[in-house]
């Protein structure tokens, strides 16, 4: 019995140590480099109050019907009150969105990125997944992901997002290694 417990403990320690010392995800810059306008592009599909979007796979399945919406100013949409519209869409419930554009990094180095969402999200920057929540949650931090930015410039961004019922939020925190980790300003996003 002691051997089994020791083996299980060793496996847990190895998994935790591996995660703690994993290399940062290397981002790929946009090629060619764009000269974007401020904000992010977004396409929406609303399912009304009767047909509920329950998870990320269901949100993805309805996005083929999405229509362009008013561009987002960035990723600083704090938790709403119940019944308020989702992001720049007109509806408050059962909304799926595909968000595209670019994120600018002013210098190379190691950064931490963290998405916040209510409800689900699948977020990519520079071709690497930086956030994923497949189900329903309150306005909470998702994974904090360490990334390597090889050079200053613009990096492609793509987010699939959905909101079921209640309130909604979509935000991001970021920071360069050794510097302050804080809410990401809107001026680093372009479309």
List the model feature ranges, each with a label.
Residues 10-18:
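Bacterial N-terminal signal peptides
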Residues 22-112, 116-191:
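Extracellular/secretory pathway-exposed regions associated with glycan biology
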């Amino acid at each position: 019995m002691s051997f089994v417990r020791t083996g299980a403990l060793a496996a847990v320690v190895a998994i935790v140590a591996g995660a703690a010392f994993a290399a940062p995800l290397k981002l790929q810059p946009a090629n060619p480099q764009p000269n974007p306008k401020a904000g992010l592009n977004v396409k929406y599909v609303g399912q009304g109050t009767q047909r509920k979007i329950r998870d990320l796979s269901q949100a993805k399945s309805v996005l083929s019907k999405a229509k362009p919406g008013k561009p987002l100013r960035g990723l600083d949409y704090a938790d709403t009150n119940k019944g308020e519209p989702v992001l720049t869409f007109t509806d408050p419930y059962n909304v799926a969105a595909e968000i595209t554009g670019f994120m600018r990094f002013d210098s190379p180095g190691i950064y931490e990125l963290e998405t916040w969402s209510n409800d689900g999200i699948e977020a990519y920057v520079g071709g690497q997944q930086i956030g994923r929540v497949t189900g329903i949650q309150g306005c909470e931090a998702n994974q904090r992901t360490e990334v390597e930015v090889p050079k200053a410039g613009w990096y492609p961004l793509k987010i699939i997002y959905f909101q079921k019922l209640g309130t909604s939020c979509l935000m991001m925190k970021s920071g360069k290694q050794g510097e302050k980790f804080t809410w990401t300003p809107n001026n680093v996003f372009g479309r």
